[in-house]
């Protein structure tokens, strides 16, 4: 099945009245006209069509949900919005709340819903497997686990062919840390500032986003190094990123020579020479930083960094929790966009389209090193239901050409949103690759100081009120993360763009008062 049937939708234009902004089908195919209204906080958009009607919500009242949450669930405040959404149902790139309101999901459950909410094929496979076998643990064989291992390993280059199935990204990175230390016989592991590799006691040492750090000792043997951020970091230019959109910073580099990369490599060398032992265990890197706000490194940086790590006896770990499974478009795995071959790859989130599963893939040599030192076991890792769902997700990605859709629609989306940088002084940077885009908000383009969190919060609320859900990221929560399910269409991107632009206009109107 391809996505062609989902693209047969009418184009729209914006029709405005004194206070209402609406999208209506245009009279002729391909025609579009946009009237720029004076927007207010009551602006509404008509959404692109959706061929799905949700069931009527008949569960807990909203007030009861709030009471239960306050009394029985974690007091850590992670919910978005002043009045958190009570979601009820999902269909592909759409979400529905308890009141029947429809939202275009451009955050995908934190970059997790890869092929679409409740994808029909994945749901059918889950229902079939749930009536057959839920759980055995890996002390018994079952075909879903072996079928999935064969399918997944076929998508990875040699010698990355040994798979450890686990339950979450934190658990996967936790295991990868143990693997690196067991294989190298060393302790020190390096990760970037701004990196997010999990929230378990072990992986918190690798995670270097301030709000996730604890005021107690932890992270023994973990060392941070400067993130080669070509927008917010000290060096960057106009050719650095593997992206159709570059920074607005000037440089005199030739297209095939990046001075910023060289300077960041010198910083990496300085970390190796001053902050870790002569021999190290490894180096963790996300191909593109997710939680830190879709931060991209200079081209060729990871290739040189991997070589330096291996000179010290360390292994190189690619954290593909957010970048894997075709989301970046040009390649199936993020590490391939850097032309590197890691020793260990971790993956989660999109692997199960929201079902809790994860994996660590490594070489036979590293796997044997772990086996000699640890009887590794995971009760739920390799669960029959998880593996059946994982196989279905891989099949959908291939059958519906979702990697190609990520490339085509993602590039369209990135170039479209990049227009906002030219229009609004508070949009400092638009960056990304495929269906992974970051929009960094600033006070002004000269200082690049982050837009205050209260202002970013209001823009976020306005997007939600107009039917668009986006994520947040960055050390100062200053970057909007645009990461829709991989089945998204250009028409839906157009809607998201108009909503986001309207939210920015509303914000500028508030500022002017």
Curated annotation (Swiss-Prot):
Its EC number is 2.6.1.44, 2.6.1.40, 2.6.1.18. Expressed in the liver and kidney. Gene3D superfamilies: Aspartate Aminotransferase, domain 1, Type I PLP-dependent aspartate aminotransferase-like (Major domain). One of its GO terms (molecular function) is beta-alanine:pyruvate transaminase activity. InterPro entries: Aminotrans_3, Aminotrans_3_PPA_site, PyrdxlP-dep_Trfase, PyrdxlP-dep_Trfase_major, PyrdxlP-dep_Trfase_small. The modification N6-acetyllysine is found at residues 56, 70, 83, 261, 416, 419, 453. It comes from the Eukaryota. GO terms for biological process: glycine biosynthetic process, by transamination of glyoxylate; glyoxylate catabolic process; L-alanine catabolic process, by transamination; N(omega),N(omega)-dimethyl-L-arginine catabolic process; positive regulation of nitric oxide biosynthetic process. Disruption phenotype: Knockout mice are hypertensive. The keyword Transit peptide applies. Pfam families: Aminotran_3. The modification N6-succinyllysine is found at residues 70, 261, 303, 416, 419. It is found in: Mitochondrion. Keywords: Acetylation, Aminotransferase, Mitochondrion, Pyridoxal phosphate, Transferase, Transit peptide. It is an enzyme of class 2 (transferase). GO terms for cellular component: mitochondrion. Its cofactor is pyridoxal 5'-phosphate. The modification N6-(pyridoxal phosphate)lysine is found at residue 349. Its main location: mitochondrion. Coiled coil: none annotated. It catalyses: glyoxylate + L-alanine = glycine + pyruvate; (R)-3-amino-2-methylpropanoate + pyruvate = 2-methyl-3-oxopropanoate + L-alanine; 3-oxopropanoate + L-alanine = beta-alanine + pyruvate; 2-oxobutanoate + L-alanine = (2S)-2-aminobutanoate + pyruvate. (R)-3-amino-2-methylpropionate--pyruvate transaminase and beta-alanine-pyruvate aminotransferase are inhibited by aminooxyacetic acid. Homotetramer. Belongs to the class-III pyridoxal-phosphate-dependent aminotransferase family. Multifunctional aminotransferase with a broad substrate specificity. Catalyzes the conversion of glyoxylate to glycine using alanine as the amino donor. Catalyzes metabolism of not L- but the D-isomer of D-beta-aminoisobutyric acid to generate 2-methyl-3-oxopropanoate and alanine. Catalyzes the transfer of the amino group from beta-alanine to pyruvate to yield L-alanine and 3-oxopropanoate. Can metabolize NG-monomethyl-L-arginine (NMMA), asymmetric NG,NG-dimethyl-L-arginine (ADMA) and symmetric NG,N'G-dimethyl-L-arginine (SDMA). This is Alanine--glyoxylate aminotransferase 2, mitochondrial. It comes from Mus musculus.
